[in-house]
Amino acid sequence: MRIVKIEVPVYRYAELNDKVKEVVKDHILSATRDAQGFTDSVKHTLDVLGIEKAEVYYSLGNCQGDGLCFTGSITWNKAIEILYIKESIAKLNKDFIKSCEDCIYSINFYKFDRMYNHCNTVTVEFEDSNWMYAEDFTKLKDIFLTWYKALCGKFEHQGYKWFYEISEEDVVEYCDNNDIEFTANGDVFVEPT
């Protein structure tokens, strides 16, 4: 047997070339940004908005059909606290609004397409909406779907940032705080003991 000593150049993050820095960023993103953390963040926001029994679905792989959606329900009283919904409903017939206040307890978001996870795979239904005229029902449904799609779009945008973007400052801070060094190809250097 023989023992061989190999010398390996080791670099701090700031010393790496730009191509290798991108490799390091990808490694750090995968180590620090987990799917559960993103899901919990979205669920927390939905909870603050008053969405009950929320389930979040997403596929953010930069592919056709990608997106984010959620299911759950919100009470009428919580829904009209949301500025967009409140302002949009105020433009509807006053008698119709009064009837909605009296008859609709919850608004439910249901997923009807299990293959994809974008906002167009969910529909909105109103508890006890049989009394509504088709035109009024369509207007009300459009208000909620417009709000829903805008909210999903914001979450989707945040998701892409969560999984695919990290600032240079955050990478430097992470590497410095953890005293991480790298080989020339961006692999983390672990000094043998």
Task: Tell what function each PLM region has.
Residues 1-193:
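Alpha-helical propensity feature that highlights long, continuous alpha-helices across diverse contexts
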